[in-house]
C-alpha cells in the first residue's frame, strides 16, 4: 500500500511539474548601452587616463635618471615606478579593444621576470619587444628587477648604469 501511494504521489508530482503553460522569461528592462557607456565614462576612461599619466611621469623620471645617474634620480624613478605599477593594477582587468589585440597584459606584467633573457638583451643591445619570447623580459617585473635587483646597494645599481649605457637604454 505504501508503495502504491508513493508511486501515485511521484507520478502526480511529475505531471504537475510538467505544466505546458510556462511564462516567457524576458530580459532586463534597462538599456545595456547606457550602462556600458556610463561604465566607460566613469570607470574605464579615468583609470586609463591616470595610467597613461603615471607611465608618462615614469618615463620622464627614467630619462632624468639616464642623464644624471645619481641616488636622488634613482629614488624618484622608483617612486614613479610604484605609482605607475599601482595605476596598472587598476586597469589590468580592462583587457578589451586594442589592449586585447596586442596582448598588452602579457607584455606589461609577466611574472617572474626572465633575468637571463633581460641580460642577453642588454648585452646584445638588440631586442624585439614584439617577439613573444621577450614577454617575460619587459614590463613592470623587469623594471622592478632593473631598479631593485641588479645589486644589493643603490650605489652598485647606479654604478651598473654608469658603466654600461645598454642598461640605461633597456630601462
Regions found by a protein language model. Give the residues of each.
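C-terminal motif of bacterial Sec signal peptides marking the signal peptidase cleavage site
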Residues: 14-17
Amino acid at each position: 500500500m505504501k508503495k502504491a501511494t508513493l508511486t501515485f504521489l511521484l507520478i502526480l508530482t511529475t505531471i504537475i511539474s510538467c505544466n505546458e503553460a510556462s511564462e516567457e522569461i524576458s530580459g532586463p528592462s534597462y538599456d545595456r548601452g547606457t550602462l556600458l557607456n556610463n561604465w566607460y565614462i566613469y570607470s574605464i576612461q579615468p583609470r586609463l587616463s591616470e595610467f597613461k599619466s603615471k607611465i608618462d611621469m615614469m618615463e620622464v623620471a627614467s630619462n632624468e635618471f639616464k642623464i644624471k645617474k645619481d641616488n636622488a634620480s634613482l629614488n624618484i624613478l622608483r617612486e614613479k615606478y610604484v605609482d605607475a605599477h599601482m595605476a596598472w593594477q587598476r586597469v589590468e582587468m580592462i583587457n578589451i579593444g586594442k589592449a586585447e589585440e596586442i596582448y598588452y597584459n602579457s607584455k606589461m606584467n609577466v611574472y617572474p621576470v626572465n633575468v637571463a633573457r633581460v641580460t642577453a638583451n642588454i648585452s646584445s643591445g638588440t631586442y624585439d619587444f614584439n617577439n613573444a619570447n621577450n614577454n617575460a623580459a619587459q614590463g613592470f617585473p623587469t623594471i622592478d628587477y632593473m631598479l631593485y635587483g641588479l645589486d644589493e646597494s643603490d650605489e652598485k645599481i647606479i654604478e651598473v648604469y654608469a658603466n654600461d649605457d645598454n642598461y640605461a637604454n633597456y630601462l
